[in-house]
Amino acid sequence: MIVIGIAGVVGVLVAMLSMSTGLNKTLTATGDPNRAIILRGGSNGELASFLDRSSSTLIKQDPAIARHPDGLPFASGELIVITEVPRKGQSSGANVSLRGVEPKGFDIRPELNILQGRKFKPGLRELMVGAGAYKQFDGLQVGSKLKFRGSYWDVVGVFETKDAHDSELWADLDTVQSAFGRSGMSSVVVRLNYSKAFDDLKRRLSADPQLTVDVKTEQDYFSSQSSSLSSQIGSLSNIVTCIM
């Protein structure tokens, strides 16, 4: 019995370390040197961050942000909420990130490819599903309906970015805010305008008395998320080792 118990603990430890390696690889592959992410000052991630609309509007006016020929900035206010979807082959559900994005959220991410279906339409309760989530969970096929907060959402597309966003569901920002009772957003993601744009952006936004924000390159942000995750899983692994 002791041998079986030890084998079980070792199996759990190996699984945890394997999961850590896989997640770290995904997170460190996420991000573009020409993009920056702006969070509320002191936040350790998008889930803990909150920016109101006035802050988002002010951020988007910075000249370091590239602009589309239509004159609008390449910037997307984005909101992360946690919801639940069915696991494949199981009756229980699992948490998944639902990201509300603005229309320019697609333009600033040229790596995003639509594998099936189409983009969601602003103002409608429509979802796009990341390729990773599509493989992992049930009920995410194009044409399916999911129920969040008492209302039904239509799955209209499957997308791939080959990074951490593949594990997410995407929808229109305003629609997500309305459905989940949120007045603001988690972050603003922007495409930079020139080679030293990040330094200028960070300097101006950090010095603006109307803002309390942290400004990071997208690569630095996801790298820090990877380091934090590694630390947490490492601590859990040490606890398991001590129990043995």
Identify the role of each PLM range.
Residues 37, 126-128, 187-189:
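Short aromatic/hydrophobic contact patches that present stacked aromatics
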Residues 7-97, 116-118, 123, 178, ...:
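Hydrophobic, regular-secondary-structure patches
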Residues 22, 136, 200:
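Phosphate- and divalent-cation-binding pockets in alpha/beta enzyme and binding domains
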Residues 67, 86-93, 141-154, 158-240:
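Mechanotransmission and gating elements of multispan inner-membrane complexes involved in transport
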Residues 1-23, 230-244:
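Hydrophobic alpha-helical transmembrane segments of multi-pass inner-membrane transport and secretion
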Residues 75-81, 94-104, 110-175, 182-183:
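Hydrophobic secondary-structure segments that place a key small or acidic residue at a functional site
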Residues 7-11, 44, 134-135, 161, ...:
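Glycine-/small-residue-rich active-site loops that bind phosphorylated ligands and cofactors
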Residues 47-51, 138, 193:
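Extracytoplasmic/periplasmic, Sec-exported soluble proteins
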